[in-house]
């Protein structure tokens, strides 16, 4: 009996129903709730599992390199990045016979293949990889790192190598090591790689270990560094006629401030990127020496936070008590980490397309669309997770005595004001934005488009103008040709920036109008509503006027029994659950907007977006319906084409999405009756009744069914849009 799953909970292991399996899976990673857990074991388990996570990541990236080297066309892509389609891997068994084999044999391959829309070819090319041998070497190195990570994870579970709790709670040492070691040293190492390998490769020079010490990355070597003539490293940059990967038009500079894009690759100058990483390395190496550890000098985090008491007394005791609260709560730390990572991931999405760092990626439209969408969805899930763990912190880890009258306590004290303000903002945005869209819809329907309410986003246009965009005629700051900022920008810093901002061949500061104004406010509505639900869930997690003892019921409870009305749907988990729907909804609008604006830009018919995006029917007809036509045509009476797999995924995504509602709408009683009927039939069916199981089948709990429904809804939603996005973009641009 003792060895039944789950071993971490004897209570669950003895459960005679299938609840044992589902609750076991649900709580497998909730180490805090396991039998015999101690604080020390909790920290050690999490620490060891991080190594496992790293091993999986290294194995996965190794697999990417290996499959491209084995089955891809990297070497022929390198010869002509704009016209050869990059291959991700082969397709072993193309269904549907010869037509499928022909449809999927592309990119110069001998058999059916998948095309890569991840941007890895452009990335590897930019950082100096050129041959399949390079890719195999990288794959083997990452495989080695994966093995090392697994060994390290195992090692740190052995008694002699288990770190103590005090080691995990040494905030200053952790800050120093993460800032200097993780960010500082790795940024410096990356600068080294760019300067010694990638920049020479972009100029046609092949640097590897065998000639690494013979090839000077700069004609004067380390001379300028030691003599203080650092500006020499910026002299003679690549010319505007430079052909990437060759010596033609190449310069000798290694650290520059050119600004703008390389004319041929439409990506940031590699020498600018190296300079950026060197600056980051310097900042973080300094930052990693600021906190007090062995030598009694530097900042103490506790002293810093305790000293943060606003002089006017308007924020009470400020940050007093926060050090111990944060340092003793893994959920608080995880919440902060997820919030930061979520914002960074969304920023990655925004910057990867507007300031592309990888050569030729800007001309690979499907990859641009896929990467933007991918990073925005990831950001959404991570950000909602931040609030979930914030709520768990309030339930499990928050100590009111320790935080008396500090900023945390005051957040809880005036939560009504916070929640009602967010509610007001959401209602205002929602009614006004929908009102404008619906008004415009009606005007179009009645044949009077001139009666639409079209609002120019003048403040946003003014901000774009301040950054140098001249087409609006605002004549302010960088767009004022007579101003000192403009003149300095021409010579001292980033001379390429102003050209880039005013060129129409990139995605920097796209021209905006009334359609952008409306969808911007629709997205603002989504963001504020998602935030409202998440913030309310966290701030009410300990209790509310309706249910003052809520924290005693834990993070996820369905209701407090039948005798206490109004306690259903108000657990902190329910808030997270509802917020994920709004998050998906919002990112849907974000990605629709990005994609439609860009396909009209790439096709040269921006007027279609400008004219159709001001009313709802325009979005439905001219974006969704018009662009799904290729998708619905993946299979037709005349055979099939290379979009057929996306057509299938589009259908399959809808199916998964719709299945979600089956779990979301019907509750336990329905399923319990169905299960008992099926079990009855099973026991009376010859042959089938030879198979028996020990656990009595029971329906999922309310909370579990919601999770399963939410998972299907999310996965189906993303599958459907991914298929639409990739098929509609690749169908147009290849």
Curated annotation (Swiss-Prot):
Gene encoding the protein: psaB
Protein's cellular compartments: Plastid, Chloroplast thylakoid membrane
Keyword Methyltransferase: no
Topology of the protein relative to the lipid bilayer: Multi-pass membrane protein
Residues the record lists as binding chlorophyll a B3: 662, 670
Functional note: PsaA and PsaB bind P700, the primary electron donor of photosystem I (PSI), as well as the electron acceptors A0, A1 and FX. PSI is a plastocyanin-ferredoxin oxidoreductase, converting photonic excitation into a charge separation, which transfers an electron from the donor P700 chlorophyll pair to the spectroscopically characterized acceptors A0, A1, FX, FA and FB in turn. Oxidized P700 is reduced on the lumenal side of the thylakoid membrane by plastocyanin.
Family: Belongs to the PsaA/PsaB family.
Protein name: Photosystem I P700 chlorophyll a apoprotein A2
Top-level taxon of the source organism: Eukaryota
Record field: catalytic activity: reduced [plastocyanin] + hnu + oxidized [2Fe-2S]-[ferredoxin] = oxidized [plastocyanin] + reduced [2Fe-2S]-[ferredoxin]
Residue numbers binding chlorophyll a B1: 654
Organism taxonomic ancestry: Eukaryota, Viridiplantae, Streptophyta, Embryophyta, Tracheophyta
An example molecular function term from Gene Ontology annotations: electron transfer activity
Source organism of the structure: Solanum lycopersicum (Tomato)
